[in-house]
Amino acid sequence: MIHLKNGRTIWAEHVRENGAHLEYDIGDDSYAIPRSSVERVEAGGVPPAYSPASGTAQPTRDLPVFTPGGSLKLEDDLADRIVHDGHVDPDALTATERKGKPELTATAYFIAGKHEFEQGDLNQCRRYYEAALRFQPDNATVLTYYAALLLRTANAEAAVSYADRAVRSDPESPDAQAILGYAQFYTNRTREAIRSWKKSVHLRPDAAIERLIAKAERELAAEAEFSQRESSHFTLRFEGKQTSEALRRDLLTALESDYDDLVRSLGSTPRSNILVVLYSDQAYFDVTRAPAWSGAVNDGKLRIPINGLSSVTPDLARILKHELTHSFISQISGGRCPYWLNEGIAQLLEPSTVDGRGHRLAQLFHTQREIPINTLEGNFIRFSAAEATLAYDESLAAVQYISETYGTSDLQRILERIGQGSSAEAALRSTIHSSYGDLEAEVARFLVGKYGD
């Protein structure tokens, strides 16, 4: 645990001194900070309960990530042959397939797929899972993992079909029931999702899924009297007494315009209609349990508080585009985008800049009192309102620097590399040739040059 002089803390797996710098490791990535900015280093302790974005847990935007825990009976015998030295052996896969034993071959491809899933190479993972299903199309475990992959890559409609097949193949699988619940929730089948999740926790208690059931039940209660309208890319749910027809029409028009703009900016489109739910302020906080400083939530559904609004105000327009941008980013990055990059891009495309706060940020970076960017990979929900404001500003500053220096196209390439399995820092290195440490130094110079110190 590294205690910084600015009062912040970094949780690291390994720490070492290197001259004037302190180097530390988090996962596969290494970082360096000036020794002069460190107050002390302590061994032990338990990290705070949030996950880095490389693990894709983003509670205020997406449902908690669920990874199945099942295995196949031949896995233990094959695992070391299929994966060794950290890589899948394609020759071993070919040799296994030549034996002409469907169960053995399916297991080999399944092992390879799980390895690539853990490494973040979701495209290769998909190919291996599909190969496994060619040899065992009704294997509930493979179907469950494949459905989980489809959810991770924002293809919930297809995930419903595969998860349903998994449940029909093995109704007593808690993993299959859980994944089916996720897929149903993401495709606006909330009642069905609750039933599936309840079956899952009956088979195997799970506190996280119990919380999802409670959230879904709050949603159903809040939206019991809601009506619905659809446009080309959106499904709008609303309470008639809370919104006028003119506001609903203007909202859909604004969202469709934002959708087209984001397709041009980011070069990708979500695979299915996006659900937008309009709440009174109280219902919004009742359903989402979001912190008081949040203006909206995108947890796979855009949840927007609109108390007292009769038109699409400039503030509401920015919120709509910000939250919609998260849906596009999730699609491109396979749900793996770190929080700082996700929030930075969403702010940039509102559009917003740090112009009004640039001088203050320049001073913070100049005196090394900023929040280290690598610690902003995880969810901002753990921050106080003041810390969250700084985290959002730093995120926007970093993304604004990348955009103004290298262009928006490099932001898109960073997202694509993350979606292909790269860590955030590896994606930065392969596009703008910067580590996190380099990026912080470059952002500091950018802010001082643009806004003064």
Walk through the language-model features, giving the residues of each:
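Pan-zinc metallopeptidase signature
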Residues: 374-453
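TPR alpha-solenoid repeat register
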Residues: 108, 142, 176, 209-210
